[in-house]
Amino acid sequence: MPEILVAVREACADALALLLPVSCAGCDEPDVALCERCALALAPAPRRQSIEAPGGVVAVWSGLAFDGVAARVLRAIKEEGRTSLAEALAPALAAALAHAGAGDAVLVPLPTSRRSYRRRGYRVPDLLVRRVGRRPSRLLRYARRTGDQRGLDRDARARNVAQSLVATGGAGQRVVVVDDVVTTGASLGEAVRALRAGGAVVVAAVTVAATPRRRATRR
């Protein structure tokens, strides 16, 4: 879909969200999209972890822990169409990018399945990248269909996504992989593999949030 149509679609989703009855995404306080207390809970707290990928270990920087308010806000964006809340997560993603040394590297969001895109009408990683004032570069596409990752353990997740992505460009470019949440790192690892196979230089991976189940180093 052309970039201008994507932007229009996201703007329409934001406008629709403003017209609907609203409550705080973090605590359900009425008549406010995000209350002051919950907004403060989204203050960046960057953390680093590493994932294994063909070609070497990759650092993954996340701006928040995926729990509490952060988890509820992300779910509201993904499952309730509340795209305007992405603005509140922009500082966390920006902090992760800064710690990752992204600089002027190309930001490559994980692709969204056709089914998810049809259901939501927008791509969450792309939406988040735009909210930090950057342009997402769709250099990855699905080579095959994958199953739902929810409920799978680490090994099952890795098998589910193995060889599922292919790079469509990026050879010789410095790239940073972007997603909303990292759980086991299987999807990010597959993205790194595909980009490296296509000749890209992967600087790091970044996410808005990381599940607390993985060890992370706070900085």
List the predicted regions and their residue ranges.
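Glycine-rich phosphate/pyrophosphate-handling loop used in enzymes and phosphotransfer proteins
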Residues: 1-219
